[in-house]
Amino acid sequence: MSEITLPEYQSIAAELQSASLAVTPAELHGLLVGMLSGGLAINDQTWQPILFDYTNDGMGWPTTALAFAQTVFKVTANELTGSSMELSLLLPDESGEEGLFALADSLSDFVNHFISGLGLAGIALNNASDDAKEALADLEEIAKLGIDEDDDFGEQAQLLEQVIEHVKACVLTIHAEFGARPESSESKPTIH
């Protein structure tokens, strides 16, 4: 059985644009990761009406765009609930200076929409652990970051990679506290 992976960034971007949906792949992924990390159920379709309301004034998505979103949701749910502690981010993979700017902007979009997704899932942060509060505070700061045109691009690319890894750690920290878990496949003992 082959493992399902996130769709390629450019193909999903083209599909979202052709469907006239004003959301980027990074924003879509951030929103879904945020909703899942906020405790949204992983075994039903309750995420779709929330997505439609947030991105398309409550209107459903065209079939192909929705299929991309379903794939992103499924891959993300599997990663977040798996034992590997790995998280893939749906970010552009372009080279050069323009690619670095696009990557930084997309990371900011992902983080902003992750935070929105947490809100849409309705988590109560007042009872959150210090670790979760710190992770969220870090994400709020990361959302404001950008690339300085006057600094060394090679150094900034390395720093951005470190920031991306920190974003993943923050997301996993928040999901560990608030995220939904898959229902156990182990059957409970029958008492006679």
From Swiss-Prot:
Pfam families: UPF0149. InterPro entries: YgfB-like (IPR011978), YgfB-like_sf (IPR036255). One of its GO terms (cellular component) is cytosol. SUPFAM superfamilies: YgfB-like. Coiled coil: none annotated. Belongs to the UPF0149 family. HAMAP family: UPF0149. PANTHER family: UPF0149 PROTEIN YGFB. This is UPF0149 protein VP2588. The lineage of its organism: Bacteria, Pseudomonadati, Pseudomonadota, Gammaproteobacteria, Vibrionales.
